[in-house]
Design a protein with these regions (language model features):
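Intrinsically disordered, metal-sensing/regulatory segments
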Residues: 1-177
Length: 177
């Protein structure tokens, strides 16, 4: 079995946990710190997409890549709408300061989808690993500032860290994906 194939299950989990660990010990000095971290994460994935994925996709003339790209953009817009701007470091917790369920579900769905290509494109594993570090940091800050108990906070963080590996497992073992 290819080592990168195996790492596709483990590295996204480790990246998210590493980001959360960094966030636990280091807090940003300004509110713009989170936005800069997320800007790096988004720009990094955009660079991988433009320099690595798109040239590879467009070499196959039989594949209708344009439809999938448009579908992916629409899905990303929907996820951004549901997450209420959290991917830009912009959150508004309600007065009770509980984590909005739709925000958490949309971030988990995003992480699950990130895990799907890792078994077919093992070269993406390190890119997703690096992407998960700042995402883990930001999610830690969001969840840690809620009024939930520590047990619930850790449960939310643990569930999020499992989403990308679950996406990899789903594409590997479920035929309908």
């Amino acid at each position: 079995m290819n080592i990168l194939y195996s790492l596709g299950f483990v590295l996204p989990f480790i990246g998210a946990v590493l980001g959360m660990g960094i966030a636990y010990f280091v807090s940003p000095k300004t509110p713009n710190g989170l936005k800069l971290i997320l800007a790096f994460s988004g720009a990094f994935l955009l660079g991988i997409t433009i320099l690595h994925l798109m040239p590879e996709v467009f070499t196959d003339k039989e594949f209708e890549a344009g439809l999938w790209i448009i579908g992916g953009i629409i899905l990303q817009i929907l996820l951004e709408y549901l997450s209420q701007g959290a991917e830009h470091g912009h959150t508004h917790l309600k007065e009770n300061k509980l984590l909005p369920k739709v925000l958490f579900i949309s971030l988990c769905l995003h992480a699950f989808i990130e895990g799907i290509p890792l078994q077919q494109q093992s070269s993406l594993v390190w890119g997703i690993f690096i992407h998960k570090i700042p995402i883990g940091m930001v999610l830690f800050y969001i969840i840690w500032n809620t009024n939930n108990s520590k047990a619930v906070k850790f449960l939310f963080l643990f569930v999020f860290t499992l989403m990308s590996p679950l996406g990899s497992i789903a594409i590997t073992y479920l035929d309908f994906l």
